[in-house]
């Protein structure tokens, strides 16, 4: 297997997974600071996606840690395909959630502050920004794994 930096089982992959875990957990925490986020579907969607991304990233970060410490890269096509598919799907789900929350927050903020007071809108905007950062790292992980996928065929 070709050792692509950032592919599954490397230290660069661990760094990407650690960033995903931090950003997704922080986005979820900022979203859940207010109990009124259940009133809007887009906010619930982002909270659900980040609640899925966080354990996914933690599990793969632990797997990367084990692979780095044992110095054994996972060489099964099926495992790398599942990791690639999960990263790819979750990256676009988090992009959709981040875009939806960013646009809904902008819409609520432009309503003369009647619906979304100052700190509440800032919390939602920070949550959307953290979700965008998580999306970027998820997409990078998916692309690195996609890049190393053909080397398992021969």
UniProtKB/Swiss-Prot annotation:
Cytoplasmic side: 1-12, 63-81, 150-154
Transmembrane segments: 13-33, 42-62, 82-102, 129-149
InterPro entries: CASP_dom, CASPL-5
Keyword annotations from UniProtKB, A to Z: Cell membrane, Membrane, Transmembrane, Transmembrane helix
Any one Gene Ontology cellular component term annotated for this protein: plasma membrane
Compartment(s) where it occurs, according to its Swiss-Prot or TrEMBL record: Cell membrane
Bilayer disposition of the protein: Multi-pass membrane protein
Extracellular side: 34-41, 103-128
Top-level lineage group: Eukaryota
Family per record: Belongs to the Casparian strip membrane proteins (CASP) family.
Assembly and oligomerization: Homodimer and heterodimers.
Protein name: CASP-like protein ARALYDRAFT_485429
Species, as recorded: Arabidopsis lyrata subsp. lyrata (Lyre-leaved rock-cress)
């Amino acid at each position: 297997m070709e050792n692509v930096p950032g592919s599954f089982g490397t230290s660069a992959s661990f760094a990407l997974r650690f960033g995903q875990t931090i950003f997704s957990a922080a986005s979820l925490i900022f979203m859940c600071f207010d109990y009124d986020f259940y009133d809007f579907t887009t906010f619930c969607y982002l909270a659900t996606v980040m609640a899925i991304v966080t354990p996914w990233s933690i599990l793969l970060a632990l797997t990367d840690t084990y692979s780095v410490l044992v110095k054994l890269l996972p060489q099964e096509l099926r495992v790398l395909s599942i990791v690639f598919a999960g990263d790819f799907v979750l990256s676009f789900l988090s992009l959709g959630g981040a875009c939806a929350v960013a646009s809904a927050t902008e819409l609520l903020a432009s309503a003369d502050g009647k619906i979304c007071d100052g700190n509440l809108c800032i919390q939602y905007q920070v949550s959307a920004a953290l979700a965008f950062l998580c999306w970027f790292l998820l997409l990078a992980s998916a692309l690195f794994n996609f890049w190393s996928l053909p080397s398992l065929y021969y």
